[in-house]
């Protein structure tokens, strides 16, 4: 498990893995959002331990006004949300009634489940929605149909494989998610990211996002 970093911002965003953190950093830069510090809690089984460590960091109780947590739904979005709430409850933090609905004060807590509160999947599922109308996606679909027909099997994690195949079609192939977002390859203005925008607005509090 990664250790929490020194708290330097009142608004803390806790994400699952470095790739998700890099994407959110790029997304916030694109939106002009500042004042949010990203923390990486590692894997899903490490969230409870990470939150315990974060809550005893110097400055957490006195400084932190907002706490956002991002987790993949994986196979069950309801179970994923309950798991996050269990981790929050375990350290005495407010537990939201549902994703995207903030609760409490100092810290105000909000949870985002990806791709959404009702669908299995992950960050890459959201990315695929954002680029669904790109002409290259037809090629990606044909590629995996061919792979399945020729080999009799497909990658275990299809969303990750599909987004990597899509990014291989870009002028600068092979970029990781955060770099791909900064390069303009992931359609950051897409409605597919509406939940992400709503989540960041909740994390920002009454001031909201920049105009």
Language model regions located:
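Short N-terminal binding/cap micro-motifs at the start of the first secondary-structure element
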Residues: 20-24
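C-terminal accessory helical subdomains adjacent to catalytic cores in phosphodiester-
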Residues: 2-8, 26-37, 51-68, 72-211
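Early extracytoplasmic/lumenal segment of secretory-pathway proteins
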Residues: 40
